Structures are given as structure tokens and as C-alpha cells.
Amino acid sequence: VWPRGIECQMYQAHLGRVFPIRGATLEGGEMIHDASNPPGQWNTFEVYSEEGRVATVLNGKLVGLASNADPRIGHIALESEGVPTQFRNIRIKRFSPTHHLRDAPGPDRR
């Protein structure tokens, strides 16, 4: 069962892409570039979300940017789709706006 929401892709070939699933909507979200480490090495993956803007940062580099995301609130889920996946040092915390989200397009930036 796939919930309606915003997905931040962790599949190796598309790491960092942001896209809507099950009726959710957003603008943008394409993967900007590949910043992933080779298979077998750990990656650091950060997701920032504020007021409908979503930014993904992989190994310290901005790799995905979306705006006007709907829904803006909901559950956070981690999943592995058919391949072994390991997670470590998972943190969820509030933050003050970062430069990643200031760069995101939005209705107030058109």
C-alpha cells in the first residue's frame, strides 16, 4: 500500500529525485546531478522541507529541489524496494531555514 505523499528517491540511479505519489503534487523535483558514492560506500542523505519546498542534499551537495508540494504534512517513511538497504544515524529535527530552501522556487519567488 502506497500512501499519498512526496517521495525522495533513494534508489542508486536516481538518488535525490523528489516526486509525488498517489495524487500528491509538486513542481520541479528532477535530480540536478549525481553526487552518490560508489555502491558499497555510505551516503549522507538529507531532506529539508518547509512551506511546500523540498530540498534533497546528498553527500553535502544539493541534488533535488521542488516547490508547491502537497501534502505539506504527514508521515515520514523509509522503504527499500527490492534491494538490501541499510540506514544508520537517522535524525529528525526542526531547523531554521537553510540556503537549500531559499534557492527553491515558490509562489513568492515568481
Regions found by a protein language model. Give the residues of each.
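Carbohydrate-interacting regions of secretory-pathway proteins
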Residues: 1-110
